Amino acid sequence: MNALRGWLAALGSMLLASAAQLGMRWGMSRLPLPEAWAGQTPERAALLAVALAVAAYAASLLCWLAALRHLPLGRAYSLLSASYALVYLLAASLPAFDETFSTSKILGVGLVVLGVLTVNARRTAAAPAHHPSRKAP
């Protein structure tokens, strides 16, 4: 059950971090450049999107801490890599982001997904490896 909690927390962290990236991109693309902040009134929706994205990052961090409690770092961290693929696919699919698909980017996303699957593939039952910090019985 603890492993399931870890996987759910890692998935939550990945989804929240991805939403945060998209929200920040959308909001920041609608705000004026910092040097123009004094002379312009920022768009409220853009400010709200950035604020919600920061909150999503905070929630993502809490999920990440829960994931680390229950999963090995190597497995949990690979799911964060999947968020890069998810952000690209969503940004290229949604018209609000004006991103495009390309063969090289799709190949890169495929490699990231393949890496995540490889890291998280179940190992066959083998003799447990000796760990140098553990004493033999």
Curated annotation (Swiss-Prot):
InterPro entries: Flippase_ArnF, Small_drug/metabolite_transptr. Translocates 4-amino-4-deoxy-L-arabinose-phosphoundecaprenol (alpha-L-Ara4N-phosphoundecaprenol) from the cytoplasmic to the periplasmic side of the inner membrane. It comes from Pseudomonas aeruginosa (strain LESB58). Residues 25-44, 98-100 are periplasmic. It is a multi-pass membrane protein. Heterodimer of ArnE and ArnF. NCBIfam families: PRK02971.1-2 (NF002816). The keyword Electron transport does not apply. GO terms for cellular component: plasma membrane. GO terms for molecular function: carbohydrate derivative transmembrane transporter activity. The keyword Transmembrane applies. Keywords: Cell inner membrane, Cell membrane, Lipid A biosynthesis, Lipid biosynthesis, Lipid metabolism, Lipopolysaccharide biosynthesis, Membrane, Transmembrane, Transmembrane helix, Transport. Residues 1-3, 66-76, 122-137 are cytoplasmic. GO terms for biological process: lipid A biosynthetic process; lipopolysaccharide biosynthetic process. It is found in: Cell inner membrane. The chain crosses the membrane at residues 4-24, 45-65, 77-97, 101-121. Belongs to the ArnF family. This is Probable 4-amino-4-deoxy-L-arabinose-phosphoundecaprenol flippase subunit ArnF. Pathway: Bacterial outer membrane biogenesis; lipopolysaccharide biosynthesis.
